[in-house]
C-alpha cells in the first residue's frame, strides 16, 4: 500500500501564489477576538464541580532553558488533600442521592433523607485533617501491592500445577495406548 503525506503551505506564500481569479480556495483567516478556551478577566468564574483549574505552579509555563521542577512534598500533600476533599464531597453526594432514591421508592417521606450540613453526620466534612501521612499512604500501598502480588502468584501456581497434572495424565494415557498398540493382547512376559 502506498502512503503519502501532504503539508499545508505557510500563509506568507499564499498571497504570492494565489491570484484573485485562482480556482483554489484561500485559507480561512482566524476571527479576531478571544480564543474559545480563554475568558476575559472580568467574566464571572466557572461554577464549582464543572471545571477545575490547576494550581498556579502548573498554570505558568516554564521559561525555555530551565529545568522542569518536581513538586515539593508540600505541593503533593496539598494536591492529595484537595483530591481527598473532592472525593469526600462526591461520596457524601452519592450517599445523599442513594438515601433520597430509597425514600422515593418507598413512597414515604423521611425528614432525615437529606442531611443538613450542620448535622452531626456530616461533621467529617468540617474536619479537613488528613487521616494518614504521606509515608503511611506509601506503606499502605506497598502492603496492598504485596498482598495482591502474593494472591496472583498463588493463583498462577495453582493454574500451573493443574495444567502440569493434565499434561502428565495425557502423557500416561498416550504411553499406555502406545504400549497396547505395540504389544496388543499378548500376555506380558519378563523375558523379551
UniProtKB/Swiss-Prot annotation:
Sites bearing Phosphothreonine, chain numbering: 72
Record localization: Nucleus
GO molecular function, one term: transcription coregulator activity
Expression sites (tissue/organ): Widely expressed with the highest expression in heart, liver, placenta and peripheral blood leukocytes.
Protein name per Swiss-Prot or TrEMBL: Akirin-1
Note: 'Akiraka ni suru' means 'making things clear' in Japanese. The name is given based on the presence of the clear nuclear localization signal.
Function as written in the Swiss-Prot or TrEMBL entry: Molecular adapter that acts as a bridge between proteins, and which is involved skeletal muscle development. Functions as a signal transducer for MSTN during skeletal muscle regeneration and myogenesis. May regulate chemotaxis of both macrophages and myoblasts by reorganising actin cytoskeleton, leading to more efficient lamellipodia formation via a PI3 kinase dependent pathway. In contrast to AKIRIN2, not involved in nuclear import of proteasomes.
Low complexity composition-biased segments: 50-60
Biological process annotations from GO: myoblast migration involved in skeletal muscle regeneration; negative regulation of satellite cell differentiation; negative regulation of skeletal muscle satellite cell proliferation; positive regulation of lamellipodium assembly; positive regulation of macrophage chemotaxis; positive regulation of myoblast differentiation; positive regulation of transcription by RNA polymerase II
Biased composition (Pro residues): 31-49
Family: Belongs to the akirin family.
Membrane-spanning parts: none
Positions with biased composition (Polar residues): 104-122
Keywords assigned by UniProt, alphabetized: Nucleus, Phosphoprotein
